[in-house]
Curated annotation (Swiss-Prot):
Acts as a transcriptional coactivator for NOTCH proteins. Has been shown to amplify NOTCH-induced transcription of HES1. Potentiates activation by NOTCH3 and NOTCH4 more efficiently than MAML1 or MAML3. Residues 81-165, 340-359, 369-506, 531-630, 658-680, 705-743, 784-820, 1059-1100 are annotated as: Disordered. It comes from Homo sapiens (Human). Belongs to the mastermind family. The gene is MAML2. This is Mastermind-like protein 2. Gene3D superfamilies: 6.10.250.970. PANTHER family: MASTERMIND-LIKE, MASTERMIND-LIKE PROTEIN 2. It is found in: Nucleus speckle. It is linked to A chromosomal aberration involving MAML2 is found in mucoepidermoid carcinomas, benign Warthin tumors and clear cell hidradenomas. Translocation t(11;19)(q21;p13) with CRTC1. The fusion protein consists of the N-terminus of CRTC1 joined to the C-terminus of MAML2. The reciprocal fusion protein consisting of the N-terminus of MAML2 joined to the C-terminus of CRTC1 has been detected in a small number of mucoepidermoid carcinomas. Residues 113-122, 440-470, 588-630, 706-725, 733-743 have a biased composition (Low complexity).
Length: 1156
């Protein structure tokens, strides 16, 4: 057991250490590196300790038998003499006997035992007595100046037979023999490194001799060391250093040995100390080492590998690691090394004081010897001993954490010993006053180091990131103390992480945003983290660069601290950097020049964007019906002009800010090249970047949603990448900017519409099909709508009441809707460009929703449009409502095609939804949340928190689009009625915004949507298609239709019936939509297109109908977290018994799985 387990532990420790070392080396920043190294050390120490304990057990049996045969006398003497150390001494003795047995089972080891017996008689430390005596004998010889000779003479002989036997054992037992050899070391507690028992014995003896010479008395020292030694032995890591340190001590007699230990420790980077090579302090030990390792070449190889690993860690010469790698490694290490997490910072602090490492090692090893306070406290701290020395490089940084050593002096000393006080190899020798002085000095050094690190480490890190700048090494980012640096590091690719890691103060905010920007590559969860909490950020990226950094709050805290103001101020410059592809890698180049270039690029991009917008407007207009063209042209042209003006102003402001920030912090900015910058998505088109900058910069300055905006940017950038036709990222950023965004968003939407000409053409074809389907569905819906309405009223009168109010609002704004349709067209363009996939999903959802709702749907779809306004939520929610609704409608029109094209781009699954949802959903969502704040708040809050709500807004928009179509066909009154019963509730959140939007939508709906009616069915079909159409319709009818149940059930069924046709055409859309809707479950559950979108855009469901949305959302996602299980159950319970059929089709596994 022990034998087998120990190898695993050492293998895990060594392998983990080596892997961690490589990874840690990859970490650019010394902090993360130190944290990783410390964790590696801790893990190695734990593995070694475990391995030693197992080996100790295994070898105890063997060693006891062999040692009892050979050294039974020595063991008895050592056990008797060292009463306290009897256990550990027994272990050591057994280990020693085992070492003697394994290394020199023949008399030659016995001869050293004999010598050690003589020494034992001379010196009373028996438990390790064999070791102590042998060591003392060696110490005496070393004091005599013959330590090397004696060690070489005695130990090599011991190791020579040991080598023979070990070679035989290696051949026979292989790793088992290595374990035995290691056990020899572990007997000395240095096995893990594979140190020879003799070397350890020498070390122990040396240490004992040192302690004795130190004046503590051989017995006491032997006792302490017997404890420490035994403790150290289990500490295997410490034994390596200890062995190295002690051998150096052996060279010098008495305190001289002690001083030598310190010197050699200092000389030793700590790397060799941890490794068996530093046994070379005594060539004898090395000889013994090789001899015993001769049997254990693997062990020796392990130690050199560890040395190299630790050297790399200490030198931080390893190539930078990617943030994900560091994050994964650190998280894994944290999970595995949780007990050491606290120690990591301390260890880094402890490890920083190299000179004390010998003592630390001793103390660490003394873990096994609770008798020594050093041991217990030092062991966790010293578990890095093998890696600890490697921290010599990190000592400056570690020293900052050294104040932790100010733990109880007993513990603090082990810690501080590693920091400074432990410089004395014989820690016990240091007087208590001296220890206190050392602790104080360590604290002072720590404070100074923190200051210097904060001041200099950023530059050092900046140097590291600059060297690794393009590389995604997250730690280079840490040097982003300056906001400008953090901002630049915010470049679209990897800068988000750099911002986090980089600036300690400004980089805090920047880091948060940086992470937000960076998540684009890593997915929307980062965006969510961005919005949610700096903690989340720290969890995501910050964990990678700062796990070790975190102990140093000076640099780490700023990153974790989420300062909306700072972030707002910093983000503008960061956004421009994102806009600039050249900013992908911010090296330490002159940032001002870059900013100027960026400004020029932005201006050029703005011009290009304006031109493109005009062209896109023309194209879109040409592709859209005359009415739509006129409305879009009028609204887009005006909006584009406004947006362009705003964008230019914003860009100018941003450029000015960037210049100022860069000028203020040009030194920190070089780190912007932080390797994490590439983490951002592929650079967006300059125009899109400019739009994103403008859109984001405006809202960021005044909005608290900067994080979400950045997230949106990420999403948008994903959308832009995924959807070639539309610069979706720009419109996304526009809605983020707020009401001002609407103009820029509209311009972006125009651009997107231009880019989506082809999708519009496809949609036109689809719309024709959809018109037929819609007509059929409308006929069915008209039939089913009254029943659904009755069912809805019966099942949920309050939501229906609200829905009725909304319907009233919808009916009134019908005239407005046409007026707002131009804005809507812009919004829909925006939605199309940004959330092409999202809106696409929404559009089919709305089609399904309207289909299922029948007449009801038009109102509901209008409400959905208003909900779609959610996207602009962070910015101008009310303004976004009307505009977004129109845009959503346009998006709905385009969405069928875009759905086909963009849905084909599953890449959009979440970011697109987020992007568009951010635009439309946010604003609409905000409005909806205002109106439906009570109902929607739980869900809206979630949706607001999570990107899905934004999607929901898109869904809302889609359904709204469908609603106008239905309204035009069936009549606004029926639509309003249907919405009143089922649809109105859907935009419960936005009664005010919803009403005017609905009126506009209905007016326009009859006009535009009559044409668009076809497209919604296509959209509707994909939405239904998202899941098995029957299952979708039934499930959605039961759940999603919750509020819509009566209408939704039958209309959904009708849609499912019609959808089979649509399914054929829309199957691709559904598939792509499913891909687009990140939660495929959302798509199926989404079944009523509003539900699907709602599920995808949970916010919409919440805004529209929390009640039925619970069902629909939970069918889709089980309300990814927005809808609680209780809500889902409530929706199920509230569902009418007549609609129970949907429950039959519900796939609880899918729902629950999606929800989980």
């Amino acid at each position: 057991m022990g034998d087998t387990a120990p190898p695993q532990a050492p293998a895990g420790g060594l392998g983990g250490a080596s892997g961690a070392g490589l990874l840690g080396g990859g970490s650019v920043t010394p902090r993360v590196h130190s944290a990783i190294v410390e964790r590696l050390r801790a893990r190695i120490a734990v593995c070694r300790q475990h391995h030693l304990s197992c080996e100790g057990r295994y070898e105890r049996g063997r060693a006891e038998s062999s040692d009892r045969e050979r050294e039974s006398t020595l063991q008895l003497l050592s056990l008797v003499q060292h009463g306290q150390g009897a256990r550990k001494a027994g272990k050591h003795t057994k280990a020693t006997a085992t070492a003697a047995t394994t290394t020199a089972p023949p008399p030659p080891p016995a001869a050293p035992p004999a010598a050690s017996q003589a020494a034992a008689t001379a010196a009373p430390p028996p438990p390790p007595d064999y070791h102590h005596h042998h060591q003392q004998h060696l110490l005496n010889s070393s004091n005599n100046g013959g330590s090397g000779g004696i060690n070489g003479e005695q130990q090599p002989p011991a190791s020579t037979p040991g080598d023979q036997r070990n070679s035989a054992l290696i051949a026979l037992q292989g790793s088992l023999k290595r374990k035995q050899v290691v056990n020899l070391s572990p007997a000395n507690s240095k096995r893990p490194n594979g140190f020879v028992d003799n070397s350890f014995l020498d070390i122990k003896r040396i240490r004992v001799g040192e302690n004795l010479s130190a004046g503590q008395g051989g017995l006491q020292i032997n006792n302490g060391q017997s404890q420490i030694m035994s403790g150290t032995l289990p500490m295997s890591q410490a034994p390596l250093r200890k062995t190295n340190t002690l051998p150096s001590h052996t060279h010098s007699p008495g305190n001289g040995l002690f001083n030598m230990g310190l010197k050699e420790v200092k000389k030793e980077p700590g790397e060799t100390l941890s490794c068996s090579k530093h046994m070379d302090g005594q060539m004898t030990q090395e000889n013994i080492f090789p001899n015993r390792y001769g049997d254990d070449p693997g062990e020796q190889l392990m130690d050199p590998e560890l040395q190299e690993l630790f050297n790399e860690l200490t030198n931080i010469s390893v190539p930078p690691m990617s943030d994900l790698e560091l994050e994964n490694m650190i998280n894994a290490t944290i999970k595995q090394d949780d007990p050491f997490n606290i120690d990591l910072g301390q260890q880094s602090q402890r490890s920083t004081p190299r000179p004390s490492l010998p003592m630390e090692k001793i103390v660490i090893k003394s873990e096994y010897s609770p008798g020594l306070t050093q041991g217990p406290s030092g062991s966790p701290q010293l578990r890095p001993p093998s890696a600890g020395p490697a921290f010599s490089m990190a000592n400056s940084a570690l020293s900052t954490s050294s104040p932790i050593p100010s733990v109880p002096q007993s513990q603090a000393q082990p810690q501080t010993g590693s920091g400074a006080s432990r410089a004395l190899p014989s820690w016990q020798e240091v007087s208590h006053a001296q220890q206190l002085k050392q602790i104080a000095a360590n604290r002072q050094q720590h404070a100074r180091m923190q200051q210097h690190q904060q001041q200099h480490q950023p530059t050092n890190w900046s140097a590291l990131p600059s060297s690794a700048g393009p590389s995604p090494g997250p730690f280079g980012q840490e040097k982003i103390p300056s906001p400008s640096f953090g901002q630049q590091t915010f470049s679209p690719q990897s800068s988000p992480m750099p911002g986090v890691a980089g600036g300690s103060g400004q980089s805090k905010v920047m880091a948060n945003y940086m992470y937000k920007a960076g998540p684009s590559a890593q997915g929307g969860h980062l965006d969510v983290l961005m919005q949610q909490k700096p903690q989340d950020l720290s969890r995501s990226f910050i964990n990678n660069p700062h796990p070790a950094m975190e102990p140093r709050q000076g640099n780490t805290k700023p990153l974790f601290h989420f300062n909306s103001d700072q972030a707002n101020q910093q983000m503008p410059s960061v956004l421009p950097s994102q806009n600039k592809p050249s900013l992908l890698h911010y090296t330490q180049q002159q940032q001002q020049q870059q900013q100027q270039q960026q400004q020029q690029q932005q201006q050029q991009q703005q011009q290009q964007q304006q031109q493109q917008q005009q062209q896109q407007q023309q194209q879109q207009q040409s592709s859209i019906s005359a009415q739509q063209q006129q409305q879009q042209q009028s609204s887009i042209s005006a909006q584009q002009q406004q947006q362009q003006q705003q964008q230019q102003q914003q860009q100018q402001q941003q450029q000015q800010q960037q210049q100022q920030q860069q000028q203020q912090q040009p030194s920190s900015q070089p780190a912007q090249s932080l390797p994490s910058q590439p983490l951002l998505r592929s650079p967006l088109p300059l125009q899109q970047k400019l739009l994103l900058q403008q859109m984001q910069n405006q809202p960021i300055a005044g909005m608290g949603y900067q994080v979400s905006q950045q997230q949106r940017q990420d999403q948008h950038s994903v959308v832009g990448q995924n959807t070639g036709p539309s610069p979706s990222p720009n419109p996304c950023s526009n809605p983020n900017t707020g009401s001002g965004y609407m103009n820029s968003q509209q311009s972006l939407l125009n651009q997107q519409l231009m880019g989506k000409k082809q999708t519009l053409q496809r949609q036109i074809m689809e719309q024709k099909q959809q018109l037929l389907l819609q007509q059929q569905m409308l006929a069915d819906a008209e039939k089913i709508a009254p029943q659904d309405q009755i069912n809805r009223h019966l099942s949920r009168p309050p939501p229906d009441y609200k829905d009725q109010r909304r319907n009233v609002g919808n009916m009134q704004p019908t005239a407005q809707y046409s007026g707002g349709s131009s804005t809507i067209s812009l919004n829909s363009n925006q939605a199309l460009a940004n959330p092409v996939s999202t809106h696409t999903i929404l559009t089919p959802n709305s089609s399904l929703l309207s289909t299922s709702h029948g007449t009801r749907m038009p109102s509901l779809s209008t409400a959905v449009q208003n909900m779609g306004m959610y996207g602009n939520l962070p910015c101008n929610q009310p303004n976004t409502y009307s505009v977004t609704s129109g845009m959503n409608q346009l998006t709905q029109q385009r969405n069928p095609k875009q759905l086909l094209a963009n849905q084909n781009n599953p890449m959009m699954p979440r970011p697109p939804t987020l992007g568009p949802s951010n635009n439309n959903n946010v604003a609409t969502f905000g409005a909806g949340s205002v109106g439906n704040s009570q109902q929607l708040r739980p869900n809206l809050t979630h949706s607001m928190a999570s990107m899905p709500p934004q999607r929901t807004s898109n869904v809302m928009i889609t359904s709204n689009t469908t609603a106008p179509n239905w309204a035009s066909q069936e009549g606004t009154s029926k639509q309003q009625e249907a919405l009143t019963s089922a649809g109105v509730r859907f935009p419960t959140g936005t009664p005010a915004a919803y009403t005017p939007n609905q009126s506009l939508q209905q007016a326009v709906g009859s006009q535009q949507f009559s044409q668009r009616a076809v497209a919604p069915p296509n959209q509707l079909t994909p939405a239904v298609q998202m899941r098995p159409m029957n299952q979708m319709s039934q499930t959605l009818n039961g759940q999603t239709m919750g509020p819509l149940r009566g209408l939704n059930l039958r209309p959904n069924q009708l849609s499912t019936q019609i959808l089979p046709n649509l399914n054929q055409s829309g199957t691709g859309l559904n598939q792509s939509r499913t891909g687009i809707n990140q939660p495929p479950s959302l798509t199926p559950s989404n079944f009523p297109s509003p539900n699907q979108s709602s599920r995808a855009f949970q916010g919409t469901d919440h805004s529209s109908d929390l009640a039925f949305d619970f069902l629909s959302q939970q069918n889709d996602n089980m309300g990814p977290a927005l809808n609680s299980d209780a809500d889902f159950i409530d929706s199920l319970l509230k569902t009418e018994p007549g609609n129970d059929d949907w429950m039959k089709d519900i796939n609880l596994d899918e729902i629950l799985g999606n929800n989980s």
